Amino acid sequence: MARYTGPSCRLCRRENMELFLKGERCYTDKCAIKRRNYPPGQHGQGRPKVSNYGVQLREKQKVRRIYGILEKQFRSYFQEADRLKGVTGENLLSLLERRLDNVVYRLGFAASRTEARILVRHNHFTLNGKKANIPSIQLRAGDVVELKEKSRKIACINESLDAVVRRGIPQWLELEKDAYKGVVKTLPVREDITMPIQEQLIVELYSK
């Protein structure tokens, strides 16, 4: 399945929730969900009855779109989550949260996960003092993500940092804004992920 390149706001309307794909715009009244809270398309306002399979599929698609993951990679994450000890659905969300691009976004260096992925690929960050340009790197407790010196004057990064300071960051992370670095204090648990996700539906879908 190819990566989606169309309007991001259509995805939010399709999933009937804010996926925070457009950065700061998602926190304003310009958000598509706030303006048109129904699916895109000619018949979008007449939401049809959805089967159990359809509900499970939509939940999986929603999580994939939140984190910007293609189907093949998402299935690999699920298989790894299923092998780990604990609850499979919670393991899945923890693995997704611990991606380098997501941590960069959560720390406030980027306004969206898409922007964070681009910044990582363009070598703007180090991980524990070493070059890190692979968005899918899994972070562990104690890892330090730091913005390179040459990148600290980029306007969009500083604007994002100012915005996240006002909103706050997850408890499992720590941001040292003046030093342009963040630390993974602990691994994320289910209570740290506040998005309205029903991960058990994804487990049921892949268990068929």
From Swiss-Prot:
Keyword annotations: Ribonucleoprotein, Ribosomal protein, RNA-binding, rRNA-binding
SMART domains hit by this protein: Ribosomal_S4, S4
GO biological process terms on file: ribosomal small subunit biogenesis; translation
Superkingdom: Bacteria
Residue intervals passing through the bilayer: none
One Pfam match: Ribosomal_S4
MF GO annotations: rRNA binding; structural constituent of ribosome
CDD domains according to UniProt: S4
Sequence ranges assigned to domain S4 RNA-binding in this UniProt record: 98-158
Transferase found in the keyword field: no
Keyword RNA-binding: yes
An example Gene Ontology CC term for this record: small ribosomal subunit
Database matches in Gene3D superfamilies: Ribosomal Protein S4 Delta 41, Chain A, domain 1, RNA-binding S4 domain
Similarity comment text for this entry: Belongs to the universal ribosomal protein uS4 family.
Oligomer and partners: Part of the 30S ribosomal subunit. Contacts protein S5. The interaction surface between S4 and S5 is involved in control of translational fidelity.
Function of the molecule: One of the primary rRNA binding proteins, it binds directly to 16S rRNA where it nucleates assembly of the body of the 30S subunit.
Family matches, as HAMAP family: Ribosomal_uS4_B
Protein name, entry field: Small ribosomal subunit protein uS4
UniProt gene name: rpsD
